[in-house]
Structures are given as structure tokens and as C-alpha cells.
Regions:
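Glycine- and acidic/polar-rich repeat regions and solenoidal domains
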Residues: 74, 81-83, 241-244, 265-278, ...
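Active-site neighborhoods of metal-dependent hydrolases
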Residues: 321
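Acidic-residue sensor for enzyme active/binding pockets
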Residues: 71, 235, 286, 353, ...
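Extracellular polysaccharide-degrading/modifying enzymes targeting complex plant/algal/animal polysaccharides
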Residues: 2-279, 297, 306-310, 341, ...
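Beta-strand cores of secreted/periplasmic/IMS beta-sandwich domains, seen most often
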Residues: 88-91, 286, 385
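Glycine- and aspartate-rich repeat motifs characteristic of hemolysin/RTX-like Ca2+-binding segments
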Residues: 98, 287, 371
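Transmembrane beta-barrel wall of Gram-negative outer-membrane proteins
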Residues: 277-288
Length: 603
């Protein structure tokens, strides 16, 4: 019998699959006991993962012992089926880190040769902070194999469509334009990511910064507290990726309990992650971590819509993983063009379950429109369940971009979002999506932008919004906005009506406004409303109606069983929500079973 959490909104079970491989070949890698002349046996292991790659054919498991592996793993074989997979995993109970970073062992000198003030300033020759201590050094050219992240800009350098302009020209303001022009490489001093600046003189404004010269080799650095280089451990991203198949379309790869760190990759498109499926399908990724990606944490699709492929797609399971400190997006994917028009292509059967997304999307370039802790395009028959998202810098928590169908978003916790849309964002879809049993707390507006919503959609229909908790949203708790889209964005030749935003038994409080619906054809009942900071907190886009609960009920028949309530809450260390409704208190473990705990409120 299928577990109820794997039932899709249309009532069918999710296409769940597992690794049933009986691994006949097992290879071992060990930094402590391995050697470059090893044979990969348990007694004579390899020193590097790369040594195991040529032998890792279908039916092979590569067991990696504890250590820090400074390499990119590039498999040359995929698996054939659930019974013939290729697996890379950490040895049981051991910590394995695969990193794109190298330790800097070069020589520092006093920095010189660059103007210390902005170019137009006359008669001032020192930094704004004259006490600033700036040093210069050069990376080892031999550390960069194939690409040098410090020699490439963030970008993106590809057009989204086949066209004349790459998306870097979406940069709306000076902040955006500086960000896209920065280099992809990152520096880490004593484990802390340093801030890169575009101009040398900016080193004199703040410590813990660095500047890269045009050669991508020479760098100038100001250590924290204007300290000297001695006594610090400095790491630099010599590689973009941690795990990236040598060829496209590999399937049935299993990754387990591996940590990938410090990838100096670029901004999408292309969506090329520190872990990349490289257009593959049927990957099982469990218990893995991606920490510190300059651009993309992991990609599970075809990277950009300019690709053309009729190869299989989707069917990825991402379970119990963590994606943290990723600059643009933690986990993302999209379909490719094929013999079907691009907008009618789909990404089928994706499961993202029990994952953590912490402090992502720190690059302030939201107009790129690919920014989220988790973002997918054209997702079908998929589950996004029981994930924990906290700290989203300039983005949404979960963003499903256009023509999604039969999607369940359930049991997710989303905290502390700053963005143009909301904690959960659904876009341009006219078929069934269910948003149920989620908690969104503290959603704020990106500076000079819209946003600050809990659950947000635009240009959609047929979204079921059920038993969610939305608190402390700077704009709306729940908003389903509607407006016309161009004809070319009509999936399967059909536009969007803005109907059927069925909204039941949600708890919304401490927001400017409570609920907005696209048009009037909806079913709405049983919602519990609390504090709102603006009048007429219940609204409809077209025809426009701004209402209180009394007239919401009277004129539209909404929320016959809904009510206003005295609601207060306390968020304790982002782990517990103490929610009080009309004097009754509920202690919700934000790391526990969210659906069951919310159902208790309505029991």
C-alpha cells in the first residue's frame, strides 16, 4: 500500500522508485590509506575518487572514506536501471567533503598600482579608511584545470531563448550590474566567505574584501580587522563543480551522504550546479549537502531552454539533502526543447523530500528571475514535501515557474524570506496544484520591489490552498493574483481564467492584508483570520473588491464558516512555533510532522 504522503493531487500515487541494485563491484577510496598505485580494493584503496571513475560501470558502488577531496568527480558511465545503478557514497558514519577549493600557499606583498579613490575624485589619494591594510598575491596557474572561476564573470552569459541578449542585461540597477560583472571565484578566510568588490578603491571602505585583476590570477585582499596574512587559512575556488558527468543524459546514478562545497560556478542560464545531472534522468540523491555555491547548488534538468533533446527526463528523487549558502538558487531544473514546443515540454515525476535550505540567494539580482531556494519549470506529477527553508536573501522559498500540473506542495516550513514574490510562488499554470499544510513566517519586501507575501501566485487557476499557516507577511498572507499573459505563453493553446482558487481552513495573521483572489469564481471557507495592519484585508483582483470579513461573506458567500480570531505567536529559535488562537495554545515542532500538527488545530 502506498504511503498517503506520496499521493498526488489527482489521486494517483507518485511514481516512486528505489535502488534495487545488488552491487557486484565495490571500489574503495581513502585519503588516509589510499595511493595513486592502489587497485581500489578495501586493503589497497585509491587515493582519489577520479581513480575509481573509469571502473565505475553499472552495478558498481564507490565507497569513499573520510577526508577532504579537492577534485571534480566526472563519471564516464551511468546506470541502466533500478537494478543496475552506479553509486558513489560515503563510508558508513564517515564525513566526506568534495570541494572546489584549494588552500592558498603563495606569497603576499604590499598592494600597489591602483587608484584608491573613485575615478572622478581629484586631490584625494588614499582610501576612505586610510588605515586599510591591503595585500596582493597571485594564484597558482596550475591549480586551474579547464576553467578558472576568477577569469569568468558571474553572467549569465547565455540568452534565455535563442536571441541576441544574455540575461545579464536584465540587471535593473547599479547593484545588479556590479553583481553580474563580478568574478565567479570565491575566497574563504578561516572558513568564512569574503566579499568580492568590482573596484579596487572599494577595499578601502570595509575590511574582509578582495578585488580580482583582469588576468584572473592577481588578487588584492584586505583581511578582517586589517590583520596580516600570517595565521590565516585562505582557500580559493579553483573549480566550478563537484560532481558533473563527462557526457549528457546519464541515468540511474545514486549519491549518498556526500558533502560538496565551494563551487565557483556562474549564474543561470545555464543552470549548472555544483552537483549536476547534466541532462540526465532517474538520479537518487540522499543525505548529501551542497554548501557554498556561487551560483547554483544542484541542477536536475536541461539547464536552459535553448537545449534540444528527445532524451528521457525527470524522475529524480532528492531526499534528506541540504542546500545552503548558494548565491542564486539551491536546487533547480527545467525541461529542454524537443519535437514538442518548448512551453509544452514538461519535467515529470520529481520528488524533493525532507531537505534543508539555509541562507541561500544572497546575490541581490532578483530580476534574473531564476532565484529561489528551490525552483523548477514546467513540473508535472511531482511532490515537494516536508522541507525546511530558512533565510532566503533576494528570492522566493519555493518557485514553480509556469505550466505546472498535478503538484503537491505539503508540509514545508519557510522562514525569513526577502523577495519580490513570496515564500511559495506558483506561476502561469492552469491545471491542478495543491498547497497544503505549509508554514510561512516572516516574508518581507525586497527593497523597491513588490513581494512580502506568504503564498503567492500570478496568472494561474485551479490552486487548492488548504490548511496553511501564514504569519508576519509584509504584504499578503495568501495572494492569487491574475492578469492576462501574451498568447505565446498559453500551454497547449489555452490561456488562464484566474478561477478556482479554492481556499480552505488556512490560518493567516500579522500581515498587512490577509487574502487576495484573482477573480470571483472560487470556493472559500473555514479560514481563521487574525491581525491585519491595513483595512479591507480580503480582496479580489477582478472585478475589484476590497472587503472586510462581513462583506466577504455577504457579497460572495465566502468563509461562511470562517472567522476572525485573537491570534498571537512566538517563534523560538526557528525550531518551534508557539501559536495561540482564541486562548488555546499549540506548540508546533517546525522540524517535525507539520501536516499532523496542523490537523490537530482543526481537530
Amino acid at each position: 500500500m502506498v504511503d498517503s504522503k506520496y499521493i498526488l493531487p489527482n489521486g494517483n500515487p507518485y511514481d516512486l522508485w528505489e535502488d534495487h541494485t545488488q552491487y557486484k563491484t565495490v571500489l574503495y577510496v581513502s585519503q588516509k590509506n589510499g595511493s595513486l598505485t592502489g587497485d581500489g580494493s578495501e586493503k589497497n584503496p585509491f587515493l582519489t575518487i577520479a581513480q575509481a571513475v573509469p571502473l565505475a560501470k553499472p552495478g558498481t558502488k564507490v565507497i569513499i572514506h573520510e577526508g577532504i577531496y579537492r577534485e571534480t568527480v566526472r563519471p564516464i558511465y551511468g546506470g541502466n536501471s533500478e537494478t543496475e545503478m552506479v553509486m558513489f557514497c560515503a563510508a558508513e558514519g564517515e564525513q566526506v567533503e568534495i570541494t572546489g577549493a584549494e588552500i592558498f600557499n603563495g606569497t603576499f606583498r604590499d598592494s600597489e598600482g591602483w587608484k584608491k579613490q573613485e575615478g572622478s575624485i581629484r586631490n584625494r589619494y588614499d582610501f576612505d579608511q586610510p588605515e586599510a591594510k591591503v595585500y596582493a598575491a597571485k594564484f597558482d596557474r596550475n591549480a586551474f584545470i579547464g576553467t578558472n572561476p576568477f577569469g569568468a564573470i558571474n553572467g549569465p552569459v547565455l540568452p534565455w531563448w535563442n536571441g541576441p541578449v544574455p540575461k545579464l542585461f536584465n540587471a535593473k540597477n547599479e547593484t545588479n550590474r556590479q553583481i553580474v560583472s563580478l568574478r565567479r571565484g570565491m575566497l574563504f578566510c578561516d572558513g568564512e566567505r569574503m566579499e568580492q568588490v568590482l573596484n579596487y578603491y572599494q577595499l578601502g571602505e570595509k575590511d574582509n574584501r578582495f578585488f580580482i585583476e583582469d588576468d584572473g590570477i592577481t588578487f588584492h585582499i584586505r583581511f578582517k580587522g586589517d590583520s596580516a596574512p600570517e595565521g590565516h587559512t585562505l582557500e580559493y575556488t579553483a573549480r566550478e563543480y563537484g560532481f558533473y558527468p563527462e557526457e549528457k543524459y546519464f541515468a540511474y546514478i545514486h549519491l549518498q551522504n556526500l558533502t560538496f562545497t565551494k563551487g565557483g560556478n556562474g549564474f543561470p542560464p545555464p543552470q549548472a550546479g555544483v552537483i549536476s545531472t547534466n541532462c540526465g534522468h532517474h538520479w537518487l540523491v540522499e543525505g548529501c549537502k551542497v554548501l557554498y555555491a556561487n551560483g547554483v547548488g544542484m541542477d536536475i534538468g536541461f539547464q536552459c531552454p535553448n537545449r534540444f533533446s528527445t532524451e528521457p527526463r525527470g524522475h529524480h528523487i532528492i531526499r534528506g539533502c541540504e542546500f545552503s549558502y548558494c548565491g542564486i538558487v539551491g536546487l533547480t531544473g527545467m525541461p529542454a526543447n524537443s519535437e514538442t514546443f518548448y512551453l509544452d515540454n514538461i519535467m515529470p515525476s520529481i520528488l524533493v523530500e525532507d531537505c534543508r535550505f539555509i541562507d541561500n540567494c544572497y546575490h541581490n539580482f532578483e530580476s534574473l528571475c531564476e532565484n529561489a531556494a528551490f525552483k523548477m519549470h514546467r513540473l508535472h506529477d511531482s511532490l515537494i514535501i516536508n522541507n525546511y527553508i530558512s533565510g532566503v536573501g533576494y528570492a522566493s522559498g519555493i518557485w514553480l515557474d509556469s505550466f505546472n500540473e498535478n503538484i503537491l506542495i505539503e508540509g514545508n516550513v519557510i522562514l525569513h524570506v526577502v523577495g519580490t514574490y513570496g515564500g511559495i510562488f506558483l506561476e502561469a499554470s492552469n491545471d491542478l496544484q495543491t498547497v497544503r499544510h505549509n508554514i510561512v513566517i516572516d516574508s518581507r519586501i525586497n527593497t523597491n520591489e513588490n513581494g512580502g507575501n506568504g503564498i503567492y501566485s500570478h496568472t494561474c487557476e485551479d490552486i487548492k490552498t488548504i490548511r496553511n499557516i501564514c504569519l508576519e507577511c509584509e504584504k499578503y498572507g495568501i495572494v492569487h493574483h491574475w492578469h492576462d499573459l501574451p498568447e505565446w505563453r498559453s500551454p497547449g493553446g489555452s490561456g488562464f481564467c484566474g478561477f478556482n482558487f479554492d481556499t480552505f481552513e488556512n490560518i493567516v495573521s500579522h500581515c498587512d492584508y490577509l487574502v487576495m483572489l484573482g477573480r470571483e469564481k472560487n470556493e472559500v471557507d473555514g479560514n481563521i483570520y487574525g491581525v491585519h495592519r491595513q483595512p479591507a484585508p480580503l480582496r479580489i483582483v477582478q472585478p475589484r473588491a476590497w472587503l472586510d470579513l462581513k462583506h466577504w461573506q455577504k457579497n460572495y458567500g465566502y468563509d461562511v464558516n470562517g472567522r476572525m480570531a485573537d491570534i498571537s505567536y512566538e517563534l523560538q529559535e526557528d525550531k518551534r512555533l508557539i501559536l495561540t488562537i482564541d486562548g488555546k495554545t499549540f506548540d508546533i515542532d517546525l522540524l517535525g510532522n507539520i501536516p499532523a500538527q496542523i490537523d490537530q488545530i482543526f481537530a
